[in-house]
Regions:
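Catalytic center-proximal scaffold of phosphoryl-transfer enzymes
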Residues: 1-136
Length: 136
């Protein structure tokens, strides 16, 4: 992605991303989005990665995949701290590649969702846990 508008907006984007990363804690997620591949006339699946920090800004980053290498473009090499994310293996591989500089924290919304899914097979037990998580 490039062009005149992108060139003008890049310093603003980088400032927002720097601010989000400055706190040593960031929430990261990737969302699949179908996009029209230029010159092909067909749609493909890409990913809109988000980085956010409570009571701070949010930034968005576009990638055509959700590979571990994409996180190098989302998380600056200078970042140290905690990344809150889902259980997708790319986050673990990314953190392991950075040594001891990154700690992963799970996402309660994803944990809670799994208990809702388990309600069909074990409604009494699985139904109790979402209420406990909500109290947190």
């Amino acid at each position: 992605v490039g062009g005149l508008a992108a060139d003008w907006l890049k310093p603003i984007y980088e400032q927002i991303r720097t601010g989000v990363m400055a706190g040593g804690y960031v929430q990261v997620d990737e969302t699949p989005i179908d996009y029209l591949e230029p010159g092909n006339g067909k749609t493909r699946q890409g990913y809109l990665w988000t980085g956010s920090r409570p009571q701070a800004d949010v930034f968005f980053h576009w990638e055509t995949s959700r590979a571990t290498a994409c996180l190098d473009n989302v998380i600056p090499a200078t970042f140290t701290g905690t990344i809150q994310c889902d259980g997708y293996a790319a986050y673990r591989a990314f953190a392991n590649g950075r040594g001891q500089t990154i700690t992963l924290a799970g996402c309660w919304a994803h944990v809670r969702r799994k208990f809702y899914e388990a309600r069909e097979s074990s409604p009494r037990l699985a139904g109790w846990w979402p209420n406990q998580i909500q109290q947190l």
